[in-house]
């Protein structure tokens, strides 16, 4: 086993390179990207590939391509994608994650799913601004989750 330590600047450069690569691949084939990410999410939901790391990686990938799906058009190819494609993908993805919070066991697992929902939603501000009803649903679900108690994470507002 070899342990590699990256400096923060190296980590940031790697993050940006991966993000640009995902954006480029998404622009090449939006539909294929959507299918791959949806299939990966389905394997998270059915438990066959469930892990915090897998879910975090997938949700980071979805957040990193924010706005890319709705800006894709090939003049000589058959692909034409508008904002509806990104909207459909994002709504379905978040709905699946919200469903996962209902069916998954364990508060820590639920916390991981909820934090990933917050991350993805935070990466698509233009979408949320245009779809208030969807934003309201997500925010209500997150507040519902926040009212649950988590051992070791409670903060008292009253001094002892």
Sequence positions of predicted segments:
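Alpha-helical repeat/alpha-solenoid scaffolds of the HEAT/ARM/MIF4G superfamily
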Residues: 1-88
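Helix-loop junctions that connect tandem helical modules in alpha-solenoid scaffolds
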Residues: 2-10, 40-53, 96-111, 124-127, ...
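Alpha-solenoid helical repeat scaffolds
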Residues: 13, 17, 57, 116, ...
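Hydrophobic residues within the alpha-helices of tandem HEAT/HEAT-like
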Residues: 22-26, 58-69, 114-128, 142-147, ...
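Alpha-helix boundary/capping segments in eukaryotic regulatory proteins
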Residues: 30, 69, 73, 105-115, ...
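Hydrophobic core segments within long, regular secondary-structure runs in both alpha-
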Residues: 34-42, 59-62, 87-101, 118-121, ...
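C-terminal low-complexity, acidic/polar tails when present
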Residues: 49, 70-104, 109, 119-125
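Alpha-helix N-cap/helix-start motif at coil-to-helix transitions, marked by capping-box chemistry
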Residues: 56, 88-91, 111, 115, ...
